[in-house]
């Protein structure tokens, strides 16, 4: 994860209370300064601007999108709001310290100077992750070890106990980002990645991450005011994210966050945010969301996820079918078609794809005139294969997969091309 450097900030902590004697266990929570805190929200590459727009809407200041995420400022409780409401961010990182460095020991001192025992108790497990761009240091593993040592040493100076390391499911995630000359220390307020909403209870990962699905809807300006159709819905990630948008459901309402384990956690403030979110939710209207998949198991999974979000009423409001996409009529006169088709990661037979693409193009021309069709794919040959020239192509990353979100304006008998595809897959 590439976390960009941020401008040096003035000290952000309140005046330090008297430090506890070494070997004692009584540590009071240190209040966070009312002055603006600095945060960074990483996101899937390609979604930085729509995340920036989302953060502005959530009340963030000094919003600065950069490659891989968005920096922003605000009161500490803004971190609560962003964790609860951001559909696009992957995490919310709270900046704790920053300085220039030349060697590992300066990074150790930077981390050692953070008052960790006043942030969380020694009962919480920790994980340290170090990322770098153009750092002169030769071993990030050694830097990771020294940052862990700094945290442990700070605890041992204050009390008899120290936090344990848990690299799989830690309570606290500490992120350090290095540039060629600057080190920045962050604490992850989210805990588990924010795309883990809580409605996918089978424990299985989706082919399309939830925040990428929500980000694509934002890129296409979908706000719940026009029909949405996913003809290859799989387990329903796009449809479920769309339902949450249309119903104004906070994406983090079903999960917990790491900030709830911090000593300075303001439970009343967070409970108020949750109550406001619950009061703002609304029912899903029928005739808005349409989904299909040729797999009965996929359709059943989609229904379960919709039920987990809004109960049976929500699942019943979404029109779901199980059929070959090419046999379907348009579910409405027009709207947004958004889908994640197979592209080798889900169908291993390239020959099958090559014969399938023309059938998709014929179906789009025959049945879907008046719609905008958008497909995210790692296969650059999709536009030429279906015989349409994309009106837009947006680079996106689905995990490690370098993808394109192709958009096609569908007009009966127009903008169709049977020419060989351009090397970039545009059909131009």
Q: Where on the chain are the PLM-derived regions?
A:
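Short SAM/SAH-binding signature in class I
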Residues: 334-340
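Basic Arg/Gly/Lys-rich low-complexity intrinsically disordered segments
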Residues: 1-35, 316, 366, 408-428
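SAM-dependent Rossmann-like transferase core, predominantly class I methyltransferases
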Residues: 185-219
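A short, flexible beta-alpha/helix-coil linker loop
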Residues: 133-136, 192-193, 342-346
